[in-house]
Amino acid sequence: MTGRVCVLVMDSFGIGASLDAARYGDAGANTLVHIYEACKRGECDIDGVRKGPLMLPNLAGKGLYHAAMASSGLPFIDLSALAIPSGYYGYAVEQSLGKDTPSGHWEMAGVPVTFEWGYFPDKSYCFPEELISEFIKQCNLPGVLGEKHASGTIIIDELGEEHIRTGKPIVYTSADSVFQIAAHEEAFGLQRLYDICKIARNLVDKYQIGRVIARPFTGKPGSFKRTGNRKDYATPPPEKTLLDFLKEDGREVIAIGKIADIYAHQGVTQEIKADGNMALFDATLSAMKTAPQGSLVFTNFVDFDSSYGHRRDVAGYAHALEQFDVRLPELEALLQPDDMVFIAADHGCDPTFPGSDHTREHIPVLMFGPQVNSKFIGRRDCFADIGQSIAEHLQLSSPLTHGVSFL
């Protein structure tokens, strides 16, 4: 059993449009480069928070910019001015058919999603009538509000007051395979929201919907705010993932943030919840202080996606990247000789792109540790190469079905 592995998923941090991006309406998307260029133009200054060019010295030192240049071919930075990266660096291409959170995470853990998710059409009353009527009946509701594609923050501003007055939850979707339910934590009840989400999870299975998401909020009309009590009710992966194999082998699999939800709580030995990227980083550091040899610490940093990518907040995304970057030395200080850290993403969500949806992009693949030398691993043809490499390092008895190790 060799060392430990820590995986940091920078949710939505793509580094260049995939070759098939046009099929998804995402030709030209590049989350990193477009944020970098916006900062360079002075468009991401926030009084008292950040100013000027994007500053990611630690990620750059691990090969982020080298990987991004290889991914897109865009000469957005002079690589000759940078030091040789201190770790493995490259980029990966998604084989799954979607550009969503479960697809990216499952593929990373060795299970590409080769089937088509179900989606709801972008029109008024977008959900099947039988689904909504059965949902109302089984949940004993007076009705529902919304029933359309919408931004989660906008729809609670639009319908939150009516929701409180009528007791009708707000149901909506997006370009992802999701059925989302928003409700006020106090007026409707947080546990009640979770209960109706569980009912919805069973009802949407026949439509091949990837996730039911509880979207609780608080506040009063004009100042509603989503809380950190979100829960994702995902359909289980179709095959065993890296997490399952590790758990079966007696390893600790410590899921931080929404990781456990993404894998439908399968293959997880410990769940740690935290709200916000910095709290998630704190939880990761705490886990690494006590995680035993042979274990996996797996964290999803959701704010990049939910707070900045979807909301097309370029300056906020830039600031979040810099906050993440400055914490990396704290993690490095906790690494034992045989530990490895993997940094990746699950899809893109270019905040400069039209709309509010994910973008089909390559992801960065960065790996470092006390005994890891510098190496360009090039283009990886499947996110599962990450999982296969983790399996090899942790000396699992048998390799994953998908993916090629780059160790």
UniProtKB/Swiss-Prot annotation:
Keywords noted in UniProt: Cytoplasm, Isomerase, Manganese, Metal-binding
Cellular component GO terms held in the UniProt record: cytosol
Function: Isomerase that catalyzes the conversion of deoxy-ribose 1-phosphate (dRib-1-P) and ribose 1-phosphate (Rib-1-P) to deoxy-ribose 5-phosphate (dRib-5-P) and ribose 5-phosphate (Rib-5-P), respectively.
CDD domains per the UniProt record, alphabetical: PPM
Magnesium is among the record's keywords: no
GO biological process: 2-deoxyribose 1-phosphate catabolic process; 5-phosphoribose 1-diphosphate biosynthetic process; metabolic compound salvage; nucleotide metabolic process
Record protein name field: Phosphopentomutase
Catalyzed reaction equations: 2-deoxy-alpha-D-ribose 1-phosphate = 2-deoxy-D-ribose 5-phosphate; alpha-D-ribose 1-phosphate = D-ribose 5-phosphate
Entry-linked Pfam families: Metalloenzyme
Species of origin: Legionella pneumophila (strain Paris)
Location(s) in or outside the cell: Cytoplasm
Residues that span the membrane, as ranges: none
Pathways per UniProt: Carbohydrate degradation; 2-deoxy-D-ribose 1-phosphate degradation; D-glyceraldehyde 3-phosphate and acetaldehyde from 2-deoxy-alpha-D-ribose 1-phosphate: step 1/2
GO molecular function: magnesium ion binding; manganese ion binding; phosphopentomutase activity
